[in-house]
Regions:
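Short, well-ordered alpha-helix to beta-strand connector turns
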Residues: 23, 35-36, 61, 77-78, ...
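ATP-dependent carboxylate-amine ligase
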Residues: 1-14, 35-38, 51, 250, ...
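Acidic, Mg2+-coordinating active-site environments of NTP-dependent enzymes
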Residues: 9, 70-76, 171, 196-346, ...
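Short internal beta-strands
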Residues: 62-68, 233-237, 375-376, 399-406
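N-terminal leader/targeting and accessory segments in enzymes
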Residues: 1-92, 269, 293, 297-299, ...
Length: 492
């Protein structure tokens, strides 16, 4: 593709060279530099890749995109264009490179602090029940037409995102559904993407710190950007941050929740439990009247299902598809039951901060188990506040806790557990817990010491398939490990 075609819609200045330059592909990793490629120089939080421009030129790249002035003497024969924001430019250039695939599909984006992944899966289930062919991108990875790929970020970098949209379209997808993180919005990963429907789940403090957002207000503001980029916004009317988040929205709004003004309103729900089922049934009124049963527990499942229901109605899907899609949806690693015993219930969940842990335990406590047991750790090289917070919440809300590892990365598990213990002691000095550093041993302990009617929540990893020790990732699939152990000891 000619550089001129690649730059369509991008404000730029040609510094040197020609717009007739032929470009085979776009890169933003200097290690991939090769003849025929265009290298985008990005100013990152840790490093500025403009420093690698000369090295890329020496490796034969055909063109460079820069955000600030650099020494051109080392770039003979290389076309150079200057833009105001290289991240923004890369997003639009990537869309052009792959033929603007997002314009040829129904686009749905979901944002919020909690519930993005579950809501996205519920929407996917509803769409597929209606016969739609869906490509989905989010925390759990990329799914389309029976295929699955892992992704490093909830919202992939713009080049990977546009490439994925192209793969969706080529595979026959008519709808692209994705989680849209505040980081993805702030870092222009979704720049140039317009959504038919944007969804807001809820908002609470998270992702605030070095390399993320400076303040909660900034975090909220970036979340709100989605509703300047969609035709219809499906939003949680009950969240206290909704009004501020939508302050400058440009889309039509459809609301859901319990407020009497909600377009789709839940007016009563019932908790459902057996040893291998935790769910909820609820009644919907407002613009439609419907009874819904969801194969996931608790109040937050009601909200997630309401969001998916509202999206289905906005898109004109049949009520039967909405009902069936919600009824059969199961999300890997999100309150995911592992039915290994009729004596107790054990589940996996991705809850990995204070807010999500409190929400989960509040939900599980409502099912009135004999004991609520939590198996958890906290990630290494991450904020200690999460450790104190999760420890405090579990001490207050669980009957028994098993403290163990999560992804230690480059920290000692004993140091991480010590921080969690500090939070436990603050939350409840009389809290009952045990410390088992190895997570596999912790899983075995939970099973071996389970009592009749217990509800055991193994939290923090959820859908993850590995554990990270000293930067080395090794396979660790909690569902399989629990099933194997149950079979090994002859559990019934």
């Amino acid at each position: 593709m000619k550089l001129e075609q690649l730059m369509e819609g991008v404000p730029f200045t040609l510094v040197q060279g020609s717009l007739d330059t032929e470009i085979a592909d776009i890169i933003y990793d200097s290690r991939k530099a090769a003849p025929g490629l265009l290298f985008v120089c990005i100013v990152g939080t840790q490093r500025d890749s403009h420093a690698f421009a000369a090295d890329c030129a020496a490796k034969g790249v055909s063109a460079l995109v820069i955000q600030h002035d650099i020494d051109l003497s080392a770039l003979p024969g290389v076309t150079v264009v200057k833009v105001e924001s290289s991240r923004y430019a890369m997003a639009l250039m990537s869309a052009n490179l792959f033929g603007n695939p997002a314009r040829q599909m129904t686009m749905i984006g979901v944002t919020g602090t909690k519930g993005k992944t579950t809501t996205t899966h519920m929407i996917k289930s509803v769409l597929e029940a209606a016969g739609r062919k869906v490509g989905m991108i989010g925390t759990n990875g990329i799914y389309y037409m029976g295929r699955h790929k892992d992704t490093a970020n909830t919202t992939p970098e713009s080049y990977e995102l546009q490439k994925t949209f192209r793969e969706f379209l080529d595979a026959g997808c008519d709808t692209a559904l994705m989680e849209v993180s505040s980081q993805g919005l702030m870092m222009d990963r979704v720049a140039g993407v317009h959504y038919d429907v944007g969804v807001f789940t809820n908002l609470s403090p998270d992702h605030i710190g070095p390399g993320e957002h400076k303040t909660f207000e900034e975090y909220r503001s970036w979340k709100g950007q989605l509703f300047k980029r969609c035709d219809v916004g499906v939003v949680n009317i009950d969240d206290e941050n909704t009004a501020a988040l939508l302050e400058s929205h440009t889309c039509k709004l459809v609301t859901y929740g319990r407020d009497e003004k909600a377009d789709y309103r839940e007016t009563g729900y019932e908790l459902l439990r057996t040893h291998d089922f935790l769910g909820v049934a609820f009644h919907v009124t407002g613009k439609d009247v419907m009874d819904v049963k969801v194969n996931m527990p608790g109040e937050f499942s009601v909200y997630n299902a309401l969001a998916a229901l509202a999206v289905g109605k906005v898109l004109g899907l049949p009520d039967a598809a909405i009902h069936d899609g919600l009824g059969k949806c199961v999300v890997k690693g999100r309150v995911e039951l592992v039915p290994i015993s009729k004596k107790f219930t054990i589940l996996l969940d991705y809850a990995h901060n204070e807010v999500s842990t409190e929400s989960l335990l509040t939900t599980l406590r409502a099912y009135k188990p004999h004991r609520l047991v939590v198996v958890f750790g906290c990630g290494g090289n991450r904020s200690k506040l999460r450790r104190y917070g999760m420890g405090e919440i579990c001490a207050k809300m669980a009957d028994f806790s098993i403290l163990t590892e999560d992804n230690n990365r480059f920290e000692k598990v004993e140091d991480i557990i010590a921080d969690i213990r500090e939070g436990m002691n603050k939350g409840n000095p009389d809290a009952k817990f045990v410390e088992i550093p190895d997570r596999l041993d912790a899983l075995h302990y939970a099973v071996d010491h389970a009592q009749e009617g217990d509800l055991i929540a193994v939290i923090g990893k959820g859908h993850e398939t590995y554990r990270d020790r000293e930067g080395v990732k090794t396979p660790f699939l909690e569902r399989e490990l629990l099933e194997e152990y149950a079979q090994q000891i002859g559990l019934e």
